[in-house]
Structure formats: structure tokens, C-alpha cells
Curated annotation (Swiss-Prot):
NCBIfam families cross-referenced by the UniProt entry: hisS
Name of this chain's protein: Histidine--tRNA ligase
Organism of this sequence: Burkholderia pseudomallei (strain 668)
Broad class of enzyme this protein falls into: ligase
GO biological process, one term: histidyl-tRNA aminoacylation
Domain of life of the native organism: Bacteria
Gene this protein is translated from: hisS
Cysteine pairs bridged by disulfides in the record: none
Pfam family, one: HGTP_anticodon
Upper lineage: Bacteria, Pseudomonadati, Pseudomonadota, Betaproteobacteria, Burkholderiales
Length: 446
């Protein structure tokens, strides 16, 4: 292939890392606005961390024998200074790092939230991408089951706000470290009795992370998993009281749940409460939100021992659900499209457009695609395609008379007429348009 031909090749994005195009951006903005409103209602503050962190943050925080660290991280050596860096595969460890580094907990607990892209090197499929987006909350400095219950109830309120149904809550307790250690011994003994039936993945995890074997999706292993020792049977009094307290709070708030003793999560920092929100509408990728308590993590990353809990949810999966349930909001067009022809009209059109924007209206000013003036007919086609409610038209006659012509594109005019073009003095234009929009809205309500 010649150098010249190589330069002419069409470049494409990285597989599994998707563009968010204008026709989809409205749905993202709707979701983001809904989430931000919810989080404000619960008193959470936004935190934004870099997408690149030191690799050690994740090996220490997530765990070296987890799938994420072993197989899924985008890691590289910085050519400038030799540092080992990683594109963040999740954000809890980064938020905790920031809280420790900036001494954020010196004056008490913090409620934090984030929204942004994460990266995992895995096979792209529906609901699972190499670059994906998560929104999450971290409640730092809260030890009781009330914090667990509140962050779970936040999710339910979000589903209600979005209009989503059929998302079910599963909960479990991973207990404390000594309880997991006792369960680990018995679990390994049990799995060793069936080692010849375990698949390669389960055999690999048998001595490094046996708890994850319980989370296998392999149909051939389900009977073995069903009969395995359950961690919930190893809970001591403190863990049991915490788990019972959570259940009481959920029941008191009429939030249904299922106890799933096989729910273990894929990150090493969890203890006590873990939970997932699952649906059967997304195929194999049924988890849309997950979280729990991670009391050891802050100390593990160099801070003082501090209780904490949180959750993260995959934005792309929730947007898939919104599409699946036909809950995609209709994208609104701009208020006004300004059409003009002639040099004097073009200059006046700029002035009119800016004045309308000063009043809070959304305005598109026609700009020629080729540097030449377009006909009124072609401009009106663009005005209609833009989704604008009204076209404001300026030609030589309008400039000479100090007027504009206004044509409704989506409903009635100020006097109730449908699609009737009217001449309006420039100084009265804003008032006219506002009245016309009110009339259009009322017509739509009828």
C-alpha cells in the first residue's frame, strides 16, 4: 500500500469505544439531568477524578487476583518518567484516593457522586463496552446499615423517576474478614471434592479467589454452586445484626428484595452488605447497578480506618432499558430559526438573533454552507428540519420597514392561526414570540 493511499483511508473509532452522536445526546442529557436532580435531593456533592491513575491504586484497591486487574485493565508505562499508569476501570478507588490525598474527611463524613467514562479491555458485546460510563455514589464515614439502606433506596427512586420497571434488588452479606476466612477454608474443601467437574476458570480461581466460583454463569456448575457452603451461614453477631438492620429498613420502606447467597461481587474491597439491581431485559448483562460496603478500603489505601459504602451503575445499560421500554423523551428543537437574504438583511439578522438569545430563547441563525446566499425556499427547508418552533424571516422589505416576518412551523401563531406568516415590528418581536409559544403550548395540551 502506497503512502498516499494510506493517507486517504477512512479512520474509524476503536472497537468497543463508541461515539455519542447528536441524535443520541438528548437521551444522555435527560438521564444525566435526572440523576443530578436526584443526587442533589440526597445532599451528594460532585467529585471529578482523572481518567488515568497509578496502576498500584487498582492492584491494591481492587485486588491483584480479580478479573479486572488480571485481564481487563488498560495499563501502560509513561515514557516520560517510567510510571506505571492505568485508565480507570472503576472509580471507587480513585474517589477514595482523592479523599485521602486532600484530607476531605477531617471534618466528618462526606457524600460524593461522580459520572464519567471507565475503561476495560474485554470483548465488546451488548451492554458491555471497552469504554463505558458509570454514575456512582460514595458515602464515606458512615458505618451503620442506615447508610446502606439509603443508597439502595436512591436507586429505587431513580428507577421511579425514569419510569423504569422490572428492576429487582438482590442483597447479601459478605461478613467480616475473619468470617470470610473461615468460609474460604470450607469452600475450598468442598470445591476440591468436585475439582474434576470445574471448568478452567473455576479451577484457576479455586485457591486464589474461590468466592468468585460461586458467581459462575456456567450452567454445568450450577448444581455444584447451589450445594456449596454459604457465606451467610458463617456470619457472626455483628455481621448478622448489620444485615438484619438493613432488611428491616428496606421492609419499613416497602422496598422488596431477594437474599441471594451467591452474590459476591468481583472486587476485593467489599465487606458486609453487597447488592445488585438486576433485570431480565438485557440478556446476559442483567446487572444495571451494584454496590455495597467497603469499610477496609480507605485504610488499605493509606487513610485512617473509615467506614464507607457506595454503588455504581452502567449508564449505557440504563439507556438500553429506556429504549427497550420506549421511555426515550422526544428531542426538543430550538425556539427560532432566523432566515435572511441580502447583505442588509444578514446584518440585521445577527442583531435580531442576539437580542432573542438575550431573552433566553434558543436560536439558530442561518449560515450558508458554501459562502453564497441560499434561497428563501432552501432556508425554510432547513428551518423546518431543525425542529424550530418558529421561523423569523428578514428580506429587503422587512429591513426597510423595520419589521420581520414570523411563521409558525410547529403549531399556532399568537392569534391562534396555524402556520400563518405574520409581519411583526422588530421592537415587538420578543413579546410576540413569547405569546405565540404560550398559544402553541396550550394548543398542544388540548
Amino acid at each position: 500500500m502506497t503512502e498516499q493511499k494510506r493517507k486517504l483511508e477512512k479512520l474509524t473509532g476503536v472497537k468497543g469505544m463508541n461515539d455519542i452522536l447528536p441524535q443520541d445526546a438528548g437521551l444522555w442529557e435527560f438521564f444525566e439531568a435526572t440523576v443530578k436532580s436526584l443526587l442533589r435531593a440526597y445532599g451528594y456533592q460532585n467529585i471529578r477524578t482523572p481518567i488515568v491513575e497509578h496502576t498500584q491504586l487498582f492492584t491494591r484497591g481492587i485486588g491483584e487476583v480479580t478479573d479486572i486487574v488480571e485481564k481487563e485493565m488498560y495499563s501502560f508505562v509513561d515514557a516520560l518518567n517510567g510510571e506505571n499508569l492505568t485508565l480507570r476501570p472503576e472509580n471507587t478507588a480513585a474517589v477514595v484516593r482523592a479523599a485521602i490525598e486532600h484530607n476531605m474527611l477531617y471534618d466528618g463524613p462526606k457524600r460524593l457522586w461522580y459520572l464519567g467514562p471507565m475503561f476495560r479491555h474485554e470483548r465488546p458485546q451488548r451492554g458491555r463496552y471497552r469504554q463505558f460510563h458509570q454514575v456512582g455514589v460514595e458515602a464515606l464515614g458512615f458505618a451503620g446499615p442506615d447508610a446502606d439502606a439509603e443508597i439502595i433506596m436512591m436507586c429505587q427512586r431513580l428507577w421511579d423517576d425514569l419510569g423504569l420497571t422490572g428492576i429487582k434488588l438482590e442483597i447479601n452479606s459478605l461478613g467480616l474478614a475473619e468470617e470470610r476466612a473461615a468460609h474460604r477454608v470450607e469452600l475450598i474443601k468442598y470445591l476440591e471434592q468436585h475439582v474434576d467437574k470445574l471448568d478452567d476458570d473455576a479451577q484457576r480461581r479455586l485457591y486464589t479467589n474461590p468466592l468468585r466460583v460461586l458467581d459462575t454463569k456456567n450452567p454445568a456448575l450450577q448444581e455444584i454452586v447451589r450445594n456449596a457452603p454459604q457465606l451467610i451461614d458463617f456470619l457472626g453477631d455483628v455481621s448478622r445484626a448489620h444485615f438484619d438492620g438493613l432488611q428491616r429498613l428496606l421492609k419499613a420502606n416497602n422496598l422488596p428484595f431477594t437474599i441471594n447467597p451467591r452474590l459476591v461481587r468481583g472486587l476485593d474491597y467489599y465487606n458486609l452488605t453487597v447488592f445488585e439491581w438486576v433485570t431480565d431485559k438485557l440478556g446476559a448483562q442483567g446487572t444495571v447497578a451494584a454496590g455495597g460496603r467497603y469499610d477496609p478500603l480507605i485504610e488499605q489505601l493509606g487513610g485512617k480506618p473509615t467506614a464507607a459504602c457506595g454503588w455504581a451503575m452502567g449508564v449505557e445499560r440504563i439507556l438500553e432499558l429506556l429504549k427497550e421500554e420506549h421511555l426515550v423523551p422526544e428531542q426538543e428543537g430550538v425556539d427560532v430559526y432566523v432566515v435572511h437574504q441580502g447583505d442588509a438583511a444578514r446584518e440585521q439578522a445577527f442583531i435580531v438573533a442576539e437580542r432573542l438569545r438575550d431573552t433566553g430563547l434558543d436560536v439558530i441563525l442561518h449560515c450558508s454552507a458554501d459562502g453564497a446566499g441560499a434561497s428563501f425556499k432552501s432556508q425554510m427547508k432547513r428551518a423546518d428540519a431543525s425542529g424550530a418552533a418558529f421561523a423569523v424571516i428578514l428580506g429587503e422589505d422587512e429591513v426597510a420597514n423595520g419589521t420581520v416576518s414570523v411563521k409558525p412551523l410547529r403549531g399556532t401563531g399568537a392569534e391562534g392561526e396555524k402556520n400563518v406568516q405574520q409581519s411583526v415590528p422588530v421592537e415587538s418581536l420578543t413579546e410576540f414570540l413569547i405569546n405565540a409559544m404560550v398559544a402553541t403550548a396550550e394548543d398542544g395540551d388540548d
